[in-house]
């Protein structure tokens, strides 16, 4: 998977929707400021620029998490700008790799994914907007929700949740883990695997 390599680097201040971003990071499992910082790709000190009252020693309730997301939403554009600047190099590396592998609009390709929401593929499409104008097609075995935009089209074998879906994902997980970034070796961009 390329969630770590595409989601944060794809953030554009003018298009960023914080509430949607958090929705795809399991907000019901957020219990600390540290987790909020991790989701946003920030350190605790960086998070304090937007939430000066952060305390690392308390557990957050679900209503408090929603309140914090609301406070961050009021600063959405500034936060997105900060994240975008922080991840600019990773964005350039991802775009270089994707351009190397896919090229321009003459290339025909599709992505295949086991289980997902389509959100990471939306992020991929956002990364590719400067060099690829056609919608990106992704085929999912199971699509939990349907996130499409003008830049991506998702197809699903099972269009909703199926029993034992998480077991299927465990059995099919890549042994090398997620793609966490990209690096250039001998003038060739390659994935850095986690």
Please place each PLM-identified region on the residue numbering:
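Long, contiguous domain-sized segments
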Residues: 9, 15, 31, 35-36, ...
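Long, charge-dense
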Residues: 1-40
């Amino acid at each position: 998977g390329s969630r770590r390599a595409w989601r944060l680097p794809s953030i554009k201040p003018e298009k960023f929707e914080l509430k949607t971003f958090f929705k795809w990071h399991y907000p019901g499992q957020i219990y600390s400021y540290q987790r909020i910082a991790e989701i946003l790709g920030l350190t605790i000190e960086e998070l304090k620029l937007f939430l000066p009252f952060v305390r690392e020693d308390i557990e957050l309730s679900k209503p408090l998490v929603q309140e914090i997301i609301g406070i961050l939403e009021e600063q959405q554009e500034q936060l997105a700008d900060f994240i975008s600047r922080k991840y600019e190099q990773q964005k350039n590396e991802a775009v270089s790799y994707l351009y190397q592998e896919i090229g321009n609009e003459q290339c025909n390709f599709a992505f295949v994914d086991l289980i997902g929401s389509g959100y990471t593929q939306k992020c991929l499409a956002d990364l590719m907007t400067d060099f690829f104008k056609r919608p990106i097609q992704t085929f999912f075995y199971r699509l939990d929700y349907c996130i499409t935009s003008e830049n991506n089209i998702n197809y699903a074998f099972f269009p909703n949740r199926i029993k034992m879906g998480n077991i299927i994902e465990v059995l099919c997980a890549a042994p090398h883990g997620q793609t966490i970034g990209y690096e250039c070796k001998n003038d060739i961009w390659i994935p850095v695997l986690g």
